């Protein structure tokens, strides 16, 4: 594909993930029209972070990937944007998106090679969940974090993100509870 220095679906997706070029946002992707109908690439309504599962489905459905260094879009972040503020609904939606992403490879018949690459995409979303969750005070937010404990295996897929690498090391050395406490401390400092 044009602009991508490697060829082959797995190599292209791996390259884009490793370089941080394949992120959970729709605005930086040009998609062939036929993929919208053949792969049901519609956004879910009524949820926040709807780009996460949309980009996940695209990663699993596309047969090739390209890359353009040209800037053609200017992003404007709203004051109430999920990337600026986290509330209980946003946290629930993020959790639901991650859980959906975990089911997609099976549902879409992804190869083992693609799944191994794809998990790093999902691991980044899981890392975002862990870092953002402490912003939601109360037992509901803490309960969601505990429900996600069994998904911490995703942190092994950390080669594409320093954030996920750090979370993985803390989890391995100190455990999930300590990881969550450190994320809570980080959230307090960030405010």
Segments from the language model and where they lie:
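A structural signal for short, well-ordered beta-strand segments and their strand-loop junctions
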Residues: 67-68, 116
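Hydrophobic alpha-helical core bundles mediating ligand binding, dimerization, or RNAP-core interactions
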Residues: 52-55, 98-101, 122-126
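Structural motif
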Residues: 110-120, 168-169, 173
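Membrane-interface aromatic/basic loop that binds lipid-linked glycans or pyrophosphate carriers
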Residues: 135-191
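Donor-binding/catalytic cores of nucleotide-activated saccharide
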Residues: 1-66, 73-86, 109
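Catalytic core of nucleotide-sugar-dependent glycosyltransferases
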Residues: 71-79, 84-112, 128, 132-155
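Amphipathic alpha-helical repeat scaffolds of TPR domains
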Residues: 117-131
């Amino acid at each position: 594909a044009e602009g991508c220095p490697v060829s082959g679906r797995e190599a292209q997706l791996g390259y884009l993930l490793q370089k941080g070029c394949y992120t959970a946002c729709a605005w930086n992707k040009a998609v062939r029209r036929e993929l919208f109908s053949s792969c049901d690439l519609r956004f879910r309504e009524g949820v926040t972070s709807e780009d996460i599962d949309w980009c996940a489905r695209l990663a699993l459905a596309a047969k090739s990937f390209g890359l353009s260094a040209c800037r053609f879009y200017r992003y404007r972040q709203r004051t109430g944007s999920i990337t600026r503020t986290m509330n209980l609904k946003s946290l629930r939606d993020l959790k639901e998106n991650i859980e959906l992403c975990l089911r997609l490879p099976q549902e879409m018949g992804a190869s083992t090679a693609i799944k191994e690459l794809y998990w790093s995409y999902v691991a980044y979303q899981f890392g975002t969940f862990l870092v953002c969750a402490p912003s939601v005070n109360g037992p509901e937010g803490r309960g969601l974090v505990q429900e996600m404990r069994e998904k911490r295996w995703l942190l092994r897929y950390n080669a594409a993100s320093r954030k996920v690498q750090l979370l993985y090391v803390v989890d391995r050395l100190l455990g999930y509870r300590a990881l969550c406490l450190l994320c809570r401390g980080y959230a307090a400092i960030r405010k």
